[in-house]
Design a protein with these regions (language model features):
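Active-site neighborhood of HAD-like aspartate-dependent phosphohydrolases
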Residues: 11-59
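Substrate-recognition element of Asp-dependent hydrolases with the DxDx(T/V) motif
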Residues: 50-83, 94-103
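Metal-dependent phosphoesterase signature
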Residues: 26-44, 69-78, 92, 102-110
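Active-site flanking residues adjacent to catalytic metal/cofactor-binding acidic residues
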Residues: 20-22, 64, 137-138
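Asp-based, Mg2+/Mn2+-dependent phosphohydrolase catalytic module
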Residues: 77-96, 104-135, 139-181
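Non-catalytic pre-domain segments flanking phosphatase-related domains
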Residues: 2-22, 95, 181
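A short alpha-helix capping/helix-coil boundary motif
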Residues: 27-30, 63-66, 98-100, 120-123, ...
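Short glycine-rich anion-binding loops that position phosphate/pyrophosphate groups of nucleotides
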Residues: 25, 67, 140
Length: 181
């Protein structure tokens, strides 16, 4: 190859990612929508585990359904305030947030889990190697799109495996051991 062409070739590192559902994984699940800062309570061990995953060179990407927006229960600004709070508390450790604001009662969306569009967008944006990546969720619908795309799946809070979970952990502190770190 001629030296004059060498600068035209760009080599991209394939990134590994850790996808996380939000409510019930990062912050306390309330049973209703979490959109007020006073209700956005980061669960124990979350920040330590995220820091360790970052040290292991994982991209950290939150994938969350936020149907309360389309139902008029809260605004994107309120949701973003919760995400900004998480970033402040974690020293900006999350690489990106993907959210699906629609609810089936209002409008169908391929972004909304269990569909996979939010994952596909992140994979394309960050050149993610799905075979080296993980998704953690507390519901089967969190795991379905990841499994469809070849991402290893972890269910949290369940003592038994579902057909969509590759790993099962009691709480987030068990994630690193489950995946061999």
């Amino acid at each position: 190859m001629k030296d004059e062409y060498k600068d035209y070739f760009v080599y991209f590192a394939i990134m590994k990612a850790f996808f996380l559902d939000r409510d019930g994984i990062i912050n306390q699940e309330r049973g209703t929508y979490t959109y007020k800062l006073q209700d956005f309570i980061i669960l124990p061990h979350v920040l330590e585990v995220l820091l360790r995953l970052k040290d292991l060179n994982f991209k950290l990407i939150v994938i969350t359904n936020q149907a309360g927006i389309s139902r008029g229960l809260y605004t994107k600004a309120q949701m973003n305030a919760c995400h900004d709070f998480l970033q402040k508390e974690s020293q900006n450790i999350i690489d990106d947030f993907y959210y699906a604001p629609l609810h089936p009662e209002v409008s169908e969306s391929l972004s909304r889990k269990p569909d996979s569009l939010m994952f596909e967008r992140a994979i394309a944006k960050y050149d993610i190697a799905v075979s080296e990546s993980y998704m953690i969720g507390d519901k089967e619908r969190d795991l379905v799109p990841a499994r469809k795309l070849g991402i290893a799946t972890i269910i949290l809070g369940h003592t038994i495996f579902t057909k969509y979970a590759d790993y099962s952990v009691k709480d987030i502190s068990g994630v690193l051991q489950a995946i061999g770190f």
